[in-house]
Amino acid sequence: MGSEPPSSPQVVEEGADEEDEELSGAEDADLRSSSGRGSLLTRRGITLRVLLKDGLVEPGDGVLSIHYLGKKFVGDLLNDGKIRWVETGQIFNSPSAWATHCKRLVNPAKKSGCGWASVRYRGQKLVQYKTTWLHKYQPSADMSLISEGEDDEMGDDDEEEGKTTIPVEDKNKKSKPELHEIGLTQRRDRERIPVRYCTLGTRDAARDPHTLVELSAFSAINRFQPFNVAVSSNVLLLMDFHCHLTSSEVVGYLGGRWDTNTQLLTVLRAFPCRTRLADKDAAPAVEEEICQNLFMRGLSLVGWYHSHPRGPALPSLQDIDSQMDHQLRLQGSSNGFQPCLGIICGPYYHGNQGVASTITPFWVVPPPEQRPNDHGIPVAVEVTYVQDNFLTTDVLNEMMLLVEFYRSAPDLVQFSQMWSPNTSILDKIKASLSGHAPKDQAYAQILEHVYNQLRNTQ
């Protein structure tokens, strides 16, 4: 997009962004599910017009800014919620459109708009004002306002590159050690001591976004858990298997159903993302495939998972912001309020009890209304785990696809190496997955075929 002189402003439509269209996938396809329209990465959300209407922000000259790879861009917030870039006078319909345009000027390879996480209003990220809006209006928000047409992405930070799926911790690390070096990294993992939420205070740009935060209990903040959760054992088995395959972080989505009458969220299926976090080109196809799988099975998008390969299964500050952003997106569903479950899996942390992975379901409560610049509060979610009758063909096929995907990966785990003096890594995986076994004991023979494939990858 070329620059226009101030006397002839160019209006950049939000929908004109090729990158936003790529990432949104089936944006106009109604999945007939409580997750509403849009792909798994983007969906209709709160707009600047909504924040202006409700008094959370005010129009003004030079109140918006983007800091990206050492460059600063300044914009005016107009009365109608549009953005005028001060340097050229161009008009943009959304933060995503402006952010994408500016970032492409600095880095032409940039593939994604990321306005709400990158654009700042009076020095504070716009996503923080979304959080304040959610706190005031959840769960009885005006759905017509929520769907006014902002597409944004899950938490693309100002200075960081290389993500294609939902934001995860350590996304900007250029390389990670092989698992056989895990003994060398054990001491470093333990030095990442989680902090208590009460010690965080107001957001501080100087604080490491990878800082881990202990989970609070709903009762500790004088709340009741506003929904019940049931998770299928097959979901845990596939997720745990996925997280064990590589020494790098992985991500995936959770499909299920939300019953507004019983306030029960049932997680029935895991959908691993078979793509590298830095592979921008492959992400849209992977997202579209998962979107179609959800639709064909009559499931809704109900959450996401990611791994902390060698660290505690606790959310980082970055994870907290990502989870809050996900919750905002599902807030705009056709059923009104719908929870979005976050799960962190820690497969190779030596602080785990025994050989089993630590699996942590969590949710984020918006900060107190009088402290809108605080981080959201990460809370532990009580979950009922439901043992499936048998291992489904879907799960088995997905496991085999994952083996093939990571077969030649440089960070593939060395399964024959030792996890402990008496336990190989493959034996550790078997033991961890046995904790998610179905009732039908024939599953062990079925999984042995998968384990043989793992042996053949070395």
UniProtKB/Swiss-Prot annotation:
Listed Acidic residues bias regions: 14-28, 148-161
Q: Pinpoint the RAMA domain residues.
A: 42-137
Q: What is its EC number?
A: 3.4.-.-
From the record, which residues define motif JAMM motif? 306-319
Tell me which residues bind DNA: S94, S96, W116
Q: Which InterPro entries match?
A: JAMM/MPN+_dom (IPR000555), JAMM_MPN+_peptidase_M67A (IPR050242), MPN (IPR037518), RAMA (IPR040843)
The molecular function terms of the Gene Ontology recorded here are: metal ion binding; metallopeptidase activity; polyubiquitin modification-dependent protein binding
Quote the record's binding site residues for Zn(2+).
H306, H308, D319
Reproduce the UniProt comment on modification after translation: Degraded following binding to N(6)-methyladenosine methylated DNA (m6A).
Name all MPN domain ranges: 229-364
What Pfam families does this protein's entry cite?
Answer: JAB, RAMA
Picking any one GO biological process from the record gives: double-strand break repair
Q: Note the superkingdom of the native organism.
A: Eukaryota
**Cellular component GO terms, alphabetical:** BRCA1-A complex; BRISC complex
Keywords in alphabetical order, please: Hydrolase, Metal-binding, Metalloprotease, Protease, Zinc
Q: Where is this region: Disordered?
A: 1-37, 147-175
Q: What does the record say about domains?
A: The RAMA domain recognizes and binds N(6)-methyladenosine methylation on DNA (m6A). The RAMA domain mediates interaction with histones.
Question: What's the stated role of this polypeptide?
Answer: Probable protease. Acts as a sensor of N(6)-methyladenosine methylation on DNA (m6A): recognizes and binds m6A DNA, leading to its degradation. Binds only double strand DNA (dsDNA) in a sequence-independent manner.
The similarity comment for this entry is:
Belongs to the peptidase M67 family.
What name goes with this protein?
MPN domain-containing protein
| Organism (species) | Danio rerio
